């Protein structure tokens, strides 16, 4: 939707109004009213647009327009209405008889708005505690995020690594020495208490020799010197021999390990 052509394109006048134009506009509005601002310039015979005629009438040519400065009551009313209506200047002007929306807007931006704004000093004082609180919160956050580990210098790290390596090497050497000692002891015990076949062969040979010598000493007498049976004496000797042998073998096994 295109914008409607304005004053210069339609051959209408722009700029300040003359006294003759003001008189024609006032006479037409007093006679016919201003129900249609778009058709009013053509009906009144003015080379102006409808918007220019409306603003000239409302802001300058109305009979009830107040001239001069705003009173204290009017300023308070503008502040209150601005809180309720915002920047709706026409609605505010409708509740202030004799004042135009253009005048109200100008006095608001020139005087009233600056009066309501806080002073720079108070603003800085209010912002200072907020900045302090923000700094404290940032400090607490940094303290929480900092890791508890303490940084170690390269020299300390190298010494720690060397010490741990030496400790590990000593422990490995002690374990190996203990294992070798246990193995040597077990081998020594087995070698000391191992009874091979040669031991029993020598023992049996000694038994046979002692038996033969006993029989020779008896002189072939079946009953011996005391009238006892040779077989019974030999049996007793054999029993005593085997008993001593087993006792000696048991004692050797009960010897403490070196």
Swiss-Prot record:
Residues 9-61, 62-116 form the HTH myb-type domain. Induction: Induced by cold stress and flooding. InterPro entries: Homeodomain-like_sf (IPR009057), Myb_dom (IPR017930), Myb_TF_plants (IPR015495), SANT/Myb (IPR001005). Disruption phenotype: No visible phenotype under normal growth conditions, but mutant plants exhibit increased tolerance to cold stress. GO terms for molecular function: DNA binding. It comes from the Eukaryota. Residues 211-234 are annotated as: Disordered. Residues 37-61, 89-112 bind DNA. The keyword Membrane does not apply. Keywords: DNA-binding, Nucleus, Repeat, Stress response, Transcription, Transcription regulation. GO terms for cellular component: nucleus. Its main location: nucleus. It is found in: Nucleus. Interacts with TIFY11A/JAZ9. Acts as a negative regulator of cold tolerance. Negatively regulates beta-amylase genes at the transcriptional level in response to cold stress. Suppresses beta-amylase gene expression by interacting with TIFY11A/JAZ9. Maltose produced by beta-amylases has a role in protecting cell membranes under cold stress conditions in rice and may contribute to the cold tolerance as a compatible solute. This is Transcription factor MYB30. It comes from Oryza sativa subsp. japonica (Rice). The lineage of its organism: Eukaryota, Viridiplantae, Streptophyta, Embryophyta, Tracheophyta. The gene is MYB30.
């Amino acid at each position: 939707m295109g914008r409607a052509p304005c004053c210069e394109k339609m051959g209408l006048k722009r700029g300040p109004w003359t006294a003759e134009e003001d008189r024609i506009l006032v006479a037409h509005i007093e006679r016919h009213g201003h129900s249609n601002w778009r058709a009013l310039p053509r009906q009144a015979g003015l080379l102006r647009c409808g918007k220019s005629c409306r603003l000239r009438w409302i802001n300058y040519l109305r009979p009830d327009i107040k001239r001069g400065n705003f009173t204290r009551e009017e300023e308070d009313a503008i502040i209150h209405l601005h809180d309720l209506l915002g920047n709706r200047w026409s609605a505010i002007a409708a509740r202030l008889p004799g004042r135009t929306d253009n005048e109200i807007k100008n006095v608001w931006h020139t005087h009233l708005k600056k009066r309501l704004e806080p002073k720079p000093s108070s603003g800085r004082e209010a912002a200072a505690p907020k900045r302090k609180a923000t700094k404290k919160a940032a400090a607490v956050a940094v303290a929480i995020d900092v890791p508890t580990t303490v940084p170690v210098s390269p020299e300390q790290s190298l010494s720690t690594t060397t010490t741990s390596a030496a400790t590990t090497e000593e422990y490995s050497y002690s374990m190996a020495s203990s294992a070798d000692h246990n193995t040597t002891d077990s081998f020594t015990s087995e070698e000391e208490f191992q009874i091979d076949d040669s031991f029993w062969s020598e023992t049996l040979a000694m038994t046979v020799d002692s038996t033969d010598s006993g029989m020779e000493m008896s002189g072939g007498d079946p009953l011996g010197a005391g009238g006892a049976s040779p077989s019974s004496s030999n049996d007793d000797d054999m029993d005593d021999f085997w008993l001593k042998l087993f006792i000696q073998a048991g004692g050797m096994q009960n010897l403490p390990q070196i």
